[in-house]
Amino acid sequence: MSVKIRLQRFGKHKKPFYRVVAINSKNSRDGKFLEILGTYEPLLGNINLNTKNIEKWLFYGAVPTLTVKNLINKQNKNNKS
Protein backbone atom coordinates (compact mmCIF):
# COMPACT_ATOMS: atom_id res chain seq x y z
CA MET A 1 0.00 0.00 0.00
CA SER A 2 1.52 3.30 -1.05
CA VAL A 3 0.55 6.26 1.09
CA LYS A 4 0.43 9.91 0.09
CA ILE A 5 0.11 13.01 2.22
CA ARG A 6 -2.35 15.24 0.41
CA LEU A 7 -5.06 17.87 0.84
CA GLN A 8 -8.75 17.06 1.26
CA ARG A 9 -11.07 19.94 0.31
CA PHE A 10 -13.87 21.08 2.60
CA GLY A 11 -15.79 24.32 2.97
CA LYS A 12 -18.33 26.16 0.88
CA HIS A 13 -18.24 27.44 -2.67
CA LYS A 14 -15.37 29.95 -3.00
CA LYS A 15 -14.51 29.48 0.71
CA PRO A 16 -12.14 26.51 0.70
CA PHE A 17 -10.79 24.79 3.78
CA TYR A 18 -8.37 21.87 3.54
CA ARG A 19 -7.36 18.98 5.75
CA VAL A 20 -3.88 17.54 5.38
CA VAL A 21 -4.34 13.76 5.48
CA ALA A 22 -2.40 10.54 5.05
CA ILE A 23 -4.33 8.52 2.47
CA ASN A 24 -3.88 5.45 0.30
CA SER A 25 -2.78 6.70 -3.11
CA LYS A 26 -5.51 4.67 -4.84
CA ASN A 27 -8.31 6.37 -2.88
CA SER A 28 -10.05 9.44 -4.28
CA ARG A 29 -9.31 12.91 -2.94
CA ASP A 30 -12.28 12.81 -0.58
CA GLY A 31 -12.06 9.07 0.09
CA LYS A 32 -11.28 7.23 3.28
CA PHE A 33 -8.10 8.53 4.93
CA LEU A 34 -5.72 6.94 7.41
CA GLU A 35 -5.03 9.95 9.64
CA ILE A 36 -5.66 13.70 9.78
CA LEU A 37 -2.32 15.50 9.97
CA GLY A 38 -3.40 19.14 9.99
CA THR A 39 -5.46 21.89 8.39
CA TYR A 40 -4.93 24.72 5.92
CA GLU A 41 -7.12 27.81 5.42
CA PRO A 42 -5.88 29.63 2.30
CA LEU A 43 -8.14 32.67 2.69
CA LEU A 44 -6.84 33.39 6.20
CA GLY A 45 -3.37 31.97 5.61
CA ASN A 46 -3.61 29.63 8.61
CA ILE A 47 -1.44 26.51 8.51
CA ASN A 48 -1.78 24.03 11.39
CA LEU A 49 0.28 20.87 10.90
CA ASN A 50 1.11 18.08 13.34
CA THR A 51 4.80 17.78 12.47
CA LYS A 52 5.41 14.73 14.67
CA ASN A 53 2.78 12.70 12.84
CA ILE A 54 3.94 13.99 9.45
CA GLU A 55 7.50 12.93 10.25
CA LYS A 56 6.18 9.51 11.31
CA TRP A 57 4.40 9.02 7.98
CA LEU A 58 7.41 10.25 6.02
CA PHE A 59 9.55 7.72 7.92
CA TYR A 60 7.08 4.98 6.92
CA GLY A 61 7.51 5.99 3.27
CA ALA A 62 4.56 8.30 2.60
CA VAL A 63 5.08 10.72 -0.28
CA PRO A 64 3.79 14.30 0.15
CA THR A 65 2.28 16.13 -2.80
CA LEU A 66 4.07 19.24 -4.02
CA THR A 67 1.52 21.53 -2.34
CA VAL A 68 1.82 19.74 1.01
CA LYS A 69 5.61 19.84 0.76
CA ASN A 70 5.41 23.62 0.23
CA LEU A 71 3.08 23.98 3.24
CA ILE A 72 5.49 22.01 5.44
CA ASN A 73 8.39 24.21 4.33
CA LYS A 74 6.32 27.36 4.90
CA GLN A 75 5.37 26.31 8.44
CA ASN A 76 8.98 25.37 9.25
CA LYS A 77 10.14 28.78 8.02
CA ASN A 78 7.52 30.55 10.18
CA ASN A 79 8.47 28.52 13.27
CA LYS A 80 12.16 29.40 12.93
CA SER A 81 11.55 33.15 12.86
Curated annotation (Swiss-Prot):
One Gene Ontology term from the biological process aspect of the record: translation
Signal peptide per UniProt: none
InterPro entries (UniProt xref): Ribosomal_bS16, Ribosomal_bS16_dom_sf
Keyword field contains Ribonucleoprotein: yes
Pfam families: Ribosomal_S16
SUPFAM superfamilies xrefs: Ribosomal protein S16
Molecular functions per Gene Ontology: structural constituent of ribosome
Keyword set includes Ribosomal protein: yes
Cellular component terms per the entry's GO annotation: cytoplasm; small ribosomal subunit
Keyword annotations from UniProtKB, A to Z: Ribonucleoprotein, Ribosomal protein
Alphabetical list of HAMAP family matching this protein: Ribosomal_bS16
Family that this chain belongs to: Belongs to the bacterial ribosomal protein bS16 family.
Protein name as catalogued: Small ribosomal subunit protein bS16
Lineage per the UniProt record: Bacteria, Bacillati, Mycoplasmatota, Mollicutes, Acholeplasmatales
Gene from which the chain derives: rpsP
